[in-house]
Amino acid sequence: MSGKGKAGKSGGKAGSETKSMSRSSKAGLQFPVGRVHRLLKKGNYAQRVGAGAPVYMAAVLEYLAAEILELAGNAARDNKKQRIVPRHLQLAIRNDEELHKLLGNVVISQGGVVPHIAPELLPSKSSKGKKDEGVSQEL
């Protein structure tokens, strides 16, 4: 054995104390990489799960959650509310084209419906300010 090799599994001295670091903190994520890895293995999606797959999946889940929460927070603020409720999630998802496409078949309990009035039912803007000086409607 040469003297230039690593001493032990950690690569440092045998007696040194190193603080363990989670895979989530190594990747700079808030979502749990270890839990995602465990669920990927337990779900029988594939025979083997690579080391990078749970990190990538946790990052994608964290991004989607942040995107939905930001839009829902904006919807809550527009309604002058401090707390995000399912209605705000529904409005956020249905008003965003890409999220609506992704979650099109998802039903959000207590979400309600997105308000929409057909353009044909709205009052026409052309008749505003003009008076009919043509033939009278009286018989």
UniProtKB/Swiss-Prot annotation:
Modified residues (N-acetylserine): S2
GO molecular function annotations of the record: DNA binding; protein heterodimerization activity; structural constituent of chromatin
A GO BP entry: DNA repair
Alphabetized UniProt keyword annotations: Acetylation, Chromosome, DNA damage, DNA repair, DNA-binding, Methylation, Nucleosome core, Nucleus, Phosphoprotein
Annotated positions of the N5-methylglutamine modification: Q110
Short motif ([ST]-Q motif): ranges: 136-137
PTM annotation, UniProt: Phosphorylated to form H2AS128ph (gamma-H2A) in response to DNA double-strand breaks (DSBs) generated by exogenous genotoxic agents and by stalled replication forks. Phosphorylation is dependent on the DNA damage checkpoint kinases MEC1/ATR and TEL1/ATM, spreads on either side of a detected DSB site and may mark the surrounding chromatin for recruitment of proteins required for DNA damage signaling and repair. Gamma-H2A is removed from the DNA prior to the strand invasion-primer extension step of the repair process and subsequently dephosphorylated.
S-S pairs: none
Annotated compartments: Nucleus; Chromosome
UniProt xrefs under PROSITE patterns: HISTONE_H2A
Classification via PANTHER family: HISTONE H2A
Known role: Core component of nucleosome which plays a central role in DNA double strand break (DSB) repair. Nucleosomes wrap and compact DNA into chromatin, limiting DNA accessibility to the cellular machineries which require DNA as a template. Histones thereby play a central role in transcription regulation, DNA repair, DNA replication and chromosomal stability. DNA accessibility is regulated via a complex set of post-translational modifications of histones, also called histone code, and nucleosome remodeling.
Note: In contrast to vertebrates and insects, its C-terminus is not monoubiquitinated.
Subunit: The nucleosome is a histone octamer containing two molecules each of H2A, H2B, H3 and H4 assembled in one H3-H4 heterotetramer and two H2A-H2B heterodimers. The octamer wraps approximately 147 bp of DNA.
Designated name of the protein: Histone H2A
Taxonomic source organism: Agaricus bisporus
